[in-house]
A protein has these predicted regions:
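RNA pseudouridine synthases
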Residues: 1-219
Length: 219
């Protein structure tokens, strides 16, 4: 597997992770001695930080733990979000009865949730032209914590699941023709690097997601 390289120096590698490949698959394609500094879901594409040595890995992971990494995703969700943006703050933890999923817990609700905060901003709205059509909203999403499946669980909690999400999406969801996976892309990272600088990394939308948006605009 040939991974597209967004950035590389002596300590750090930023790759453009394709959808459909989990982190273990990515590891097998990395240079020997390199380690992903964080995770992206199998069907999520986008910028992935990779440390070339243990010292850099520790340096990067500490920033994630201290919530100092600025992360922005682009996602398409079901329905029309009328507001310009908002913040979702809940607890998120493992769902009882399904080890694959995370569940949103409210304050005082029995469970083992941990604090989770997600900010979102509307980029574009797609109104259905037919009476039985589906509205969609394109969002820029910034998770301020790093819980497993946080964006996906929070969007479903909001009532607007990520389009194409087979685990958190509503039953009988309408998916744009040709979209084969969830519309969730890690588009931006801002992080301090071991050389003392702060760097920003951008991953452009992949072709399958671009085609999906073009279809919605033209339909």
């Amino acid at each position: 597997m040939n991974l597209k390289i967004i950035y590389e120096d002596g300590n750090l590698l930023v790759v453009d992770k394709p959808a459909g490949i989990d982190i273990e698959g990515i590891k097998s394609a990395l240079p020997e001695g390199s380690f992903p500094a964080h995770r992206l879901d199998k069907d999520t594409s986008g910028a992935l930080l990779v440390a070339k040595n243990q010292e850099t890995l520790d340096f990067l992971q500490k920033q994630f733990q201290e919530r100092r990494v600025d992360k922005k995703y682009v996602c398409l969700v079901e329905g029309n979000i009328p507001d310009k943006g908002g913040t979702i703050e809940t607890l998120v933890g493992r769902a009882k009865g399904d080890k694959r999923k995370q569940k949103v817990y409210l304050a005082g609700e029995p469970g083992s949730g941990r604090d989770a905060k997600t900010e979102y901003r509307v980029l574009e709205r797609f109104k259905a032209r037919l009476p039985d059509g589906q509205d969609y909203t394109l969002l820029e999403v910034s998770p301020k914590t790093g819980r497993k499946h946080q964006i996906r669980a929070h969007m479903t909690y909001l009532g607007h699941p990520v389009v194409g999400d087979k685990l958190y999406g509503f039953k009988n969801q309408k998916v744009p023709t040709g979209l084969k996976r969830q519309f969730l892309h890690a588009a931006y990272l801002k992080v301090s690097t071991p050389d003392g600088n702060t760097k920003e990394f951008i991953s452009a939308l992949p072709q399958d997601l671009i085609l999906c948006l073009q279809q919605l605009k033209n339909s």
